[in-house]
Every structure is written in C-alpha cells, then in structure tokens.
C-alpha cells in the first residue's frame, strides 16, 4: 500500500509469497515503469528515505496531509490549482523563505501564485466539506489576500466602506448602462468593447455579459405607514393583526436583476416582499437600504477591518428593526445569511430557502407548475446544509427537478464572474449535460450565481423566491 509498507511486505506474507509477487511484477512490468519501488522494494529502509517535507505554513492548513479528497470540489480544479496544490505551494514558499534557498524560485512562486493560487480561488471553502479534518483552504487564501494589501488598497477599501451607497449606485448604473447599450447596439459588439477595455486595463474593467441585468433596488412593501426606527421597534402586532418580519434584501439582489422570461417573474426583492405579504406577514424593510451590506465582499477581498465596520452597521440596523431579535429576520442570499450568522454577537438571520419552506409555503396555494426546473446548490447553501429545503421548494413549483451534478461552486464568487470570468466559465463547462430537454428554467439562491449559470447553462436561472411567487400567483 505504499513506500511506508514496502519494507514489511515480506514479513507480512512470508518469503515464498513475496518471491511470487516479485515474479508477477517482473512478468507484467519487466522495465519497472509502473510504481517502481512503491509496493515492492528490496530496500528495508525505504520507509524513512525521501520523506515529503511539510513545513509549518499556516495554522489553518498545517494539518493537511495532501490526500487530495478536496480537489473535486474546487471550481478551479483542472484550471489552475486545487486546494491541495495551493497548500503544497504555500508550504514550498514558506520553506524557501526560511532557508533562503533559491531566491529566484521563491520570487517566481510568489508572482505566479497571485493568479493561480489567489485570483482563481473562489474562497467558497467547499474543500472543507470533503476534507477529513475540515480544512478551509479558502480562508487561508483570504488571509494571504489581506497580507498582500498595501496602503493604497486599504485606502480604497475604507472609501468604499464609507460610501457604500455611492458604490452601489455606481455599480447598478454601470449595469443599467450596459443594458441600455445592448438595446441599441448588438450584444456581441458591446461585449467586444468591454473585452477591449479589459485588455487595455489589465482586467480592471469588469466584463458585463448579456446575462447580467440591472437590479430593482429597494422593494416596496404594501404597508409603510410608520418608520420603525422612530420608536425603536416596529408597529405593534395588535394594530395590524398580522405577524411581522424584517426582510433584508441582499446587495447583489438589489444591484443585479433576473433575466427576462415568458413567465413575467418578479425580481428577487419584490418577489420576497410579495410572498411574505401573501403568506400573511407585515414586511419591514430598512428604509435607508442603499449601501447596506453584510460585509462579506470586503472580507473575501482581504479587508477584514472594513468588513467588520460594514457588518456592524447592518447588524445594528437589523437589531433595531427586529427589536433586538424579537422579530424574525430573513435575507434572500445564502452567502449573506451565512456571513451574518457567523458575526460575533449577531442576531439570528434566516436564509430565504429555509424560511420560505418552513413559514411561507404552508400558507400558500400553488396554482401553476413548470414541467421541470434545474436546481443549483451554491456554495453557501451547501455549507448551510440547505439542499433539502431548496429542493423541496423547487418540487413545489415543478413536476420534476434536475439537480446540477457537474458543478459544485459555480465560480462566480461575488465579482469574480465580472473580473475573472474564465473561472465561472471553467466551473460551469459541463452544466449543459445536467439539464433535461424539457427544462426551461433554473433556480439558485444567490443572484450573481444565477447570472453566471444563465450565461453558460443555456436556460435562464432565477431566484427561488421569484419562481415560488409565480407558482402561487
């Protein structure tokens, strides 16, 4: 079973059987090309020779034995590096740094690791679900991103954190402009222009594909008679007779809209409000919603302090609106829900899939169904173990469902689908094989993932809330 056991095979099986093994090996592999010295080896000290060095590199990954179980879960597998390979390169870089050996090799590894190890890492941490000891290689990469950030990067991040509303307006405006351009200029021409701009700016200009549409902004609940923050708590339930809920529309859902379909689906925020009201809830949405963010984008880019600042502002807002957690809080993006749940001292936030299944679907009447729906379990939904809830909601809206099995994380990873689109294209390269002929729509619980899947799957992907609203309309 390997070099560590090879010196003891004869002791285990005896000289006669051991000799037969050598004769069989000689017949099948006379040149000694297949695993030479791995299973059979005359050197009784081979198990203590040529040992792989595993220097301490990062406490997050130091337990890794490089077994490779993580590799199939990684969206950059067969593109750049896998989690195992990222760890191996990290260890080699640390060894070279400590020993001073071969500075030129270290410089090359440091330089090449930027793209192969960091830029093309989605930081989805699905590797941890496959790892026997739960190692989060993505967290290691986020830490390295933070270590590589300079004064200019932190200044830009601080500006973005302090002007979140302006940034959101700018991004939504950019996508709106691209939408308008496609209305008067052929889409291939628009994409050619953006690709030229990307080449001239070393990929600093985002790629805006035809699958990306401008978002709806803030939704409009039916009853906004009172600003909950004026008194510090929402309207008493006795005044309406309806249970109340705080709904936080995630920033991707506000900035990026759903693809147009023949079913007239609502964008995610308005679909969520409509569903919650249809199920009998009074919906409370933050009045000053523009710029509110869970902080995950800052953290994934390597700006933990700015992330904490942004997260704290949202947590304070949600705490006030929910009367310190007395009212349930729900958001529509699995990524945001997971991040908000992990904040120290944060109030509980439910993801849309679990809340819609438990609290909304039982109060609805399903009036129409699709023949088949494709289901994508995004990385945060997998880490939250939401697959059963997502599939149950999809089954409520369709006669059959097709769970995408050829992809794990779609590789869109926040804005990587805009700046490193090749990662999304690689991760979804086989998704068409998962979609039945009678399937005309797919669902996801993150709007950016839905955009990437729409581009590469051949059918539009929308939010679960949008589909459930249509089915119960």
What are these regions (language model features)?
Residues 1-63:
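Conserved glycine-rich FAD pyrophosphate-binding loop
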Residues 40-46, 77-113, 134-160, 462-469:
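Non-heme iron-sulfur electron-transfer modules
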Residues 29, 138-473:
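Iron-sulfur cluster-binding electron-transfer modules in prokaryotic oxidoreductases
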Residues 3-12, 50-59, 75, 99-106, ...:
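Short beta-alpha connecting loops at secondary-structure transitions
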Residues 59-68, 72, 119-122, 126-129, ...:
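Cys/His-enriched microdomains
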């Amino acid at each position: 079973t390997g070099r560590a056991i090879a010196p003891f095979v004869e002791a285990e099986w005896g000289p006669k059987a051991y000799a037969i093994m050598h004769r069989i090996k000689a017949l099948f592999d006379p040149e000694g090309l297949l695993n030479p010295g791995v299973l059979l080896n005359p050197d009784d000290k081979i198990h203590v020779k040529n040992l792989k060095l595993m220097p301490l590199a990062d406490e997050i990954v130091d337990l890794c034995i490089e077994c490779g179980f993580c590799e199939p879960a990684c969206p950059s597998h067969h593109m750049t590096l896998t989690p195992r390979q990222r760890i191996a390169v990290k260890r080699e870089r640390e060894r070279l740094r400590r020993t001073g050996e071969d500075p030129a090799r270290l410089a090359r590894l440091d330089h090449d690791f930027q793209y192969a190890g960091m830029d093309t890492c989605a930081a989805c941490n699905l590797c941890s679900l496959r790892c026997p000891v739960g190692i989060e290689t993505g967290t290691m990469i986020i830490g390295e991103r933070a270590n590589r950030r300079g004064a200019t990067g932190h200044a830009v991040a601080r500006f973005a954190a302090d002007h979140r509303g302006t940034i959101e307006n700018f991004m939504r405006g950019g996508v709106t402009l691209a939408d308008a351009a496609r209305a008067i200029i052929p889409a291939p021409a628009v994409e050619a222009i953006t690709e030229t701009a990307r080449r001239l700016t070393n990929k600093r200009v985002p790629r805006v594909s035809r699958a990306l549409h401008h978002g709806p902004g803030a939704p409009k609940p039916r009853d906004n008679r009172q600003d909950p923050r004026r008194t510090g708590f929402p309207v008493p339930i006795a005044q309406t007779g309806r249970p109340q809920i705080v709904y936080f529309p995630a920033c991707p859902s506000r900035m990026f809209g759903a693809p147009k379909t023949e079913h007239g689906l609502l964008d995610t925020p308005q679909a969520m409000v409509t569903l919650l009201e249809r199920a009998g809830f009074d919906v409370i949405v933050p009045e000053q919603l523009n710029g509110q963010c869970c902080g995950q984008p800052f953290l994934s880019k390597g700006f933990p302090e700015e992330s904490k600042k942004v997260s704290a502002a949202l947590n304070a807002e949600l705490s006030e609106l929910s009367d310190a957690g007395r009212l349930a809080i729900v958001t529509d993006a699995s990524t945001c829900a997971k991040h908000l749940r992990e904040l120290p001292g944060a109030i509980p936030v439910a993801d849309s899939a679990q809340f819609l299944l438990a609290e909304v679907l039982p109060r609805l009447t399903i009036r129409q169904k699709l023949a088949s729906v494709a289901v994508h379990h995004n990385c945060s939904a997998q880490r939250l173990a939401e697959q059963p809830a997502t599939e149950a909601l999809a089954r409520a809206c369709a006669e059959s469902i097709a769970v995408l099995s050829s992809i794990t994380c779609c590789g869109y990873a926040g804005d990587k689908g805009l700046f490193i689109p090749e990662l999304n294209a690689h991760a979804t390269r086989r998704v068409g094989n998962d979609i039945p002929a009678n399937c005309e729509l797919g669902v996801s619980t993150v709007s950016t993932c839905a955009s990437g899947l729409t581009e590469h799957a051949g059918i539009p992907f929308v939010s679960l809330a949008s589909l459930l609203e249509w089915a119960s309309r």
